Amino acid sequence: MESLILKKSLITFFIIFLFTSSTLFSGEIWIEPKDELFVKKLEFTSNSLDHPIDSTSYPISKAKLKTRTSDELLRNFYSRNNLKNKFSIKYANNLFPIRDILDSNRHEKSFSFEKTFEKNSTAGKLSVTKNISPIFDDEYLFSGTHLSMILGNSVLGIGFIERWWGPGNDNSLILSNYSDPQPGIYLESLSGFRFENFMSFIGKVNYSFFINHLDDDRVINNTNLIGARITIQPNTNLTLGFSRVTMFGGDNRPDSFESFIDNLFRLKRTENGLDLSNEIAGYDLKYNFRFNKVLISSYFQLIGEDELRFTPSTKIFTLGNEIIFLKNGLLRSVGIEYSNTISNFGDRYNTAYEHSSYKSGYRYKNLPLGAFIDGDSIFLKLTTNIELSEYFFINFSLFQGEFNKDNSGLTNVWGISNEEYAGSKIKIGYSFNKNFNLDLGILAVNKNLYFNSKEMDKITFNLGLNYNF
């Protein structure tokens, strides 16, 4: 039933889109994970003001980024992104398996078309991708397509929204953009709010809630993915995040409203001998502080199985540090991040992202919903971002790790044949003018990695050409 409702809603969206007046002007309500470098620059410029920016919960509404010093940055950003149509061609010699928050190319070969619009309190995007990669079955994808409506200080919408929950740049343990976004409905805070009573010490509060449908081929088909996140910012420097994501319902599973309430408030774990759901939850912290003209960030994220008392068990974690500064108004950053998805801080295998009933695990179309390294893995990465001009940037990183360290289990996307590895990655973005830009990525690894039972090349490159009009 949920699947039918979502599909009908999406069809309604397309009808509205096709017959909407042509007087709509270009616009986008969201800043997406791929715009992370722009958000870093905003973080730097806004830190000295009493207007904290929550950079741990993507997508980010434009209203959350408004500060006195950010206005010019926002104008420059949108002046380069104010064309309402986009045509892209992407090519890679192999699947690009080691990705981070900036990487949006999930397929070997594809071409896509986007159209964005905004009118009064409504904004949306129609994005259609033709996937011609032999490794995937989906011929057409709608990643990024959405219809959003502003209701007071909230955004209500439907679509395929890319999310990234957590302060990390390389891994988000609970929700990342590694897999394709799923169809669903959502409610997000527009600009956040503050309590005016005895709870004012909490500071600025933002929230995000969604119900998605996992429409892939699973052990339990028609599973729903339900997520909620709240962040609080007691001061300009500190951001605390609390997240929970649940797999609920599906074929031959408890899915009544009563079961939903029992699961939502953790009133009970089982019904008729069946686990009500598969939940993971946890918290994260990011602290920024200035030293001379440098912004220093320290962060961590801890996620585990959600228990009856709302306390995560069998924990996995990410921690990192980053330095951000500007040179002649251009971004420079250096960061180091470490992730460990072996449960109980490295002592328990075959637990993270797995479940006894939802046997397909915490994945969508055989790609992780959380950390790209999947379960039982470790990953360390050193990254630098250099903006050479407003139209030219370089992202370079060195990394090492080990996938599925105990080499067991049938559902881990990295299989059971990988060894310790090390490598480097470079990404270059260049805009020739307002209309035409390209992205070039090169990944070099010292071992032939296995991903979804396919052997990857040691050197992978991808090229993206984008025409905006």
Where are these regions (language model features)?
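N-terminal periplasmic/intermembrane-space "pro-region" immediately following the signal or transit peptide
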Residues: 25-103
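Short loop/turn motifs that connect adjacent beta-strands in outer-membrane beta-barrel proteins
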Residues: 52-53, 76-86, 116-125, 150-153, ...
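Transmembrane beta-strands of outer-membrane beta-barrel proteins
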Residues: 85-89, 122-128, 156, 200-209, ...
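Transmembrane beta-strands of outer-membrane beta-barrel pores
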Residues: 93-97, 119-121, 128-134, 151-153, ...
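Surface-exposed coil loops of outer-membrane beta-barrel proteins
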Residues: 96-98, 161-231, 241, 248-274, ...
